């Protein structure tokens, strides 16, 4: 019996020694890539695509993470361009954080209209391959209005045919007047949207260089080539705003095949012009020299330009207001990047995209009144709403 116990003990010791000499092989648990994160303008995840909107000529960075942290891991991409397989691209390890390793792969640059489909792969020592995808994106590029011609006149609406600086699209620009002192711009880069007519009467004159449209309160001069526009208040004779000559007065970000991601408008601005508005803000009411996001965001402290009551409307000290009629994210660069101009950029729905904005002439009271006629007036609040309001902050 003692001999048997001794043999059992020896076998156990031998097995223990064998197991102690074996190096444990840990598996790759997972890989993650989320191209657009949580769709938060100010809070980006480390596993997004960058830039979020791939533009022609730019490198595109595909970021991902693997876990747990272990030596021997590899990450790479397979992708197609316009349906054609491309050479695989290896990802570079960037850093470790917590239980995760973070990676980045660069692809591109690509041309306008390219459609890229990709899948992210990972393995450990050539085994236990895991993947996530496929994902895809369209490559876009800015196109701009190069020239315009008088297209058609309907009751309350002037339609201009737009020639872009590239591509073969047939954009159209509609000009109308909801009232004599309000000018409305409606722009369709695909030229397939029916514009709304205005209510105010107007007269129109045309020569080889320009188109002049007048109401009892406004005179709008459209330069045909290169495209530009000048808006003048007939009551005061003052030039309200103008643009022209740069080739970027009216632009749209497109794949050239029907997808439109953004619009951009530009106007000249003298150094004396001041801008007020954009809803509730926490860092001053005058916005010249600042870039303002139109994005509803609940920032608890240190709000800066972040606001949960953002309004795409401003009043200019030159005697006009501009109202961008959109519920999508927009950004107003109020002579921040360029001290001689302001620009506004706005996202689109992608389907039947239309840029729609108004220039309203008058005193501050008249401009705000004109804006409220367009946006809608608030209803009277019930009696109980005038009682105590209390916050726990």
Model-identified regions with their sequence ranges:
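Catalytic and substrate-binding clefts that recognize carbohydrates or anionic sugar/phosphate headgroups
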Residues: 144, 164-166, 205-383, 389-393
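Contiguous, structured surface segment used for ligand recognition
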Residues: 162-164, 172-226
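Beta-strand-connecting loop/turn residues
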Residues: 13, 58, 99-101, 156, ...
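Short beta-strand segments
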Residues: 87-89, 133-135, 171-173, 200, ...
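Glycan-association/targeting regions that enable binding to alpha-glucans and other polysaccharides
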Residues: 26-182, 186-190
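Sec-dependent signal peptide recognition
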Residues: 7-14
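Hydrophobic core
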Residues: 16-21
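Short, Lys/Arg-enriched N-terminal segments with co-localized hydrophobic residues
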Residues: 1-4
């Amino acid at each position: 019996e003692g001999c048997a116990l001794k043999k059992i003990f020896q076998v156990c010791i031998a097995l223990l020694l064998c197991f102690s000499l074996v190096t444990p092989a840990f598996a790759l648990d997972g890989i993650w890539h989320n191209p657009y994160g949580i769709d938060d303008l100010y809070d980006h995840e480390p596993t997004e695509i960058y830039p979020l909107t791939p533009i022609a000529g730019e490198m595109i960075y595909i970021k991902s993470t693997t876990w747990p942290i272990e030596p021997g891991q590899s990450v790479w991409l397979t992708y197609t361009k316009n349906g054609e397989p491309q050479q695989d691209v290896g990802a570079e390890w960037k850093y470790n954080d917590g239980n995760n390793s973070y990676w980045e792969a660069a692809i591109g640059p690509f041309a306008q209209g390219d459609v890229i489909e990709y899948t992210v792969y990972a393995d450990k020592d050539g085994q236990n391959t895991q993947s996530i995808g496929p994902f895809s994106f369209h490559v876009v590029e800015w196109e701009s209005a190069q020239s315009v011609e008088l297209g058609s006149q309907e009751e309350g609406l002037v339609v201009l045919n737009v020639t872009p600086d590239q591509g073969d699209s047939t954009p159209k620009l509609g000009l109308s007047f909801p009232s004599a002192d309000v000018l409305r711009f409606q722009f369709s880069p695909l030229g397939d949207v029916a514009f709304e007519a205005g209510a105010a009467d107007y007269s129109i004159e045309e020569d080889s260089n320009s188109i002049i449209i007048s109401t009892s309160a406004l005179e709008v001069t459209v330069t045909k080539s290169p495209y530009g526009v000048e808006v003048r208040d007939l009551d005061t004779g003052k030039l309200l705003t103008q643009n022209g000559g740069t080739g970027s007065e009216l632009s749209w970000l497109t794949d050239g095949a029907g997808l439109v991601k953004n619009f951009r408008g530009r106007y000249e601005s003298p150094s004396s012009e001041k801008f007020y508005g954009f809803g509730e803000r926490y860092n001053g009411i005058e916005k010249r020299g600042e870039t303002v996001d139109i994005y509803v965001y609940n920032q608890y402290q240190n709000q800066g330009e972040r606001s949960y009551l953002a309004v795409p409307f401003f009043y200019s000290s030159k005697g006009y207001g501009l109202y961008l009629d959109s519920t999508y994210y927009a950004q107003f660069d109020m002579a921040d990047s360029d001290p001689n101009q302001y620009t506004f950029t706005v996202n689109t729905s992608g389907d039947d995209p239309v840029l729609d904005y108004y220039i309203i002439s008058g005193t501050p009271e008249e401009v705000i009144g004109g804006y409220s006629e367009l946006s809608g007036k608030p209803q009277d609040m019930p009696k109980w709403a005038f009682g105590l309001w209390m916050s726990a902050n």
